[in-house]
Amino acid sequence: MRYLNKIVFLNSAHIPYSEIQLDGNVHFIGTQGVGKSTLLRAILFFYNADKLRLGIPKEKRSYDEFYLPYANSFIVYEVMRENGPYCVMAFKQQGRVAYRFIDAPYQSSWFVNERREVRADWISIRKAIGTETQISRIVVSYQEFRDIIFGNNRRPDLIGFRKYAIVESPNYQNIPRTIQNVFLNSKLDADFIKDTIIRSMNEEEVNIDLDVYRNQTKDFEQNYNDVTLWLDLSLIHISE
């Protein structure tokens, strides 16, 4: 099973550093203004990658400005999978969120140096991660990010990203919408849930050529009869 295991804020949303485990039933409590909505929106953005559908009021600062205000601002998502976790590093490039996939469990030493400062340049972060860990190219398209996460990865340029899918569905569009409605307390009717399940299924048409199986069965039957006849004749010959 694959799931979002941890979220890490580094100089993000007024948070100098925080690691939050998400690997179970998590209950967020606190008075108004302590950061519950801030955390939930960052989690939701992992699933829908849509800054216009995070429930941020128009009068508030944009997602990019609030969550990634500095060159050394990052949000890291650690995703658990069957063969070990990987990370999604979210950062700001040319004024908007971009991503890199890191094929290893999260380590704070990647981003925080010996002086307990968050690194700002990619070269030093890459050096801290090490050459043995596989790191993806930069993903700047939110549509491409959703395709990677939800398994719509049959294009040649996404072959290297297949191991990062949390589900495998080329028709996943209603899945992030459903998660979004849950996070934003929107209406979820039965028809929408049913449609989501149907569309998330693999709709590849599987054609079965019955003639092939019919011929194979016929050949097997003929061979079986020949062997049986040979054995019967051999037994008769021995008895004589």
What are these regions (language model features)?
Residues 1-120:
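Extreme N-terminal "head/tail" segments of very large remodeling/mechanoenzyme assemblies
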Residues 27, 31, 181, 185, ...:
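Conserved aromatic-histidine-acidic binding/catalytic patches
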Residues 35, 185-189:
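Generic detector of ordered secondary-structure context
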Residues 63-67, 171, 175, 218-225:
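Amphipathic alpha-helical surface "interface" segments used
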Residues 85-186:
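Glycine-rich phosphate-binding loops of NTPases
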Residues 189, 194-225:
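Mid-to-C-terminal oligomerization/interaction "stalk" domains of large proteins
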Residues 226, 230-233:
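Interface faces of extended alpha-helical assemblies
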Residues 236-238:
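Conserved small/polar residues in nucleotide/adenosyl-binding loops
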